[in-house]
A protein has these predicted regions:
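Conserved, structured core segments of small domains
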Residues: 1-96
């Protein structure tokens, strides 16, 4: 299932990670490990935020994805199911 992983990084931990060089490495490793379809980086609510779209095969993947981000960045995470336009076209008729 296509998922959106939303990663919000607290300012203090983000600043530390930028200074010690670990922020880019951790985000690159996460995007690579997930074989992300797309990844975007924004500021939201004054915080660094990553939006990573990927295919989740099994919900058992969640701890392996989340723990490095929790431990390394004290990040707040959201896993959200996501659709593209084709998925929406396919799903809408079933809702009628």
């Amino acid at each position: 299932m296509r998922m959106l992983l939303k990663v919000k990084i607290p300012t203090e931990q983000g600043n530390r990670a930028v200074k010690d060089g670990s922020l880019g490495k951790m985000l690159e490793a996460t995007v690579g490990k997930l074989k992300a379809e797309a990844a975007y980086f924004i500021a939201e609510d004054g915080l660094r935020c990553a939006l990573i779209f990927f295919d989740m095969k099994d919900s058992a993947q969640m701890p392996a994805i989340a723990e490095p981000l929790f431990i390394g960045l004290d990040a707040k995470l959201e896993f959200l199911p996501a659709m593209n336009a084709d998925d929406l076209r396919k799903g809408l008729p079933a809702s009628m």
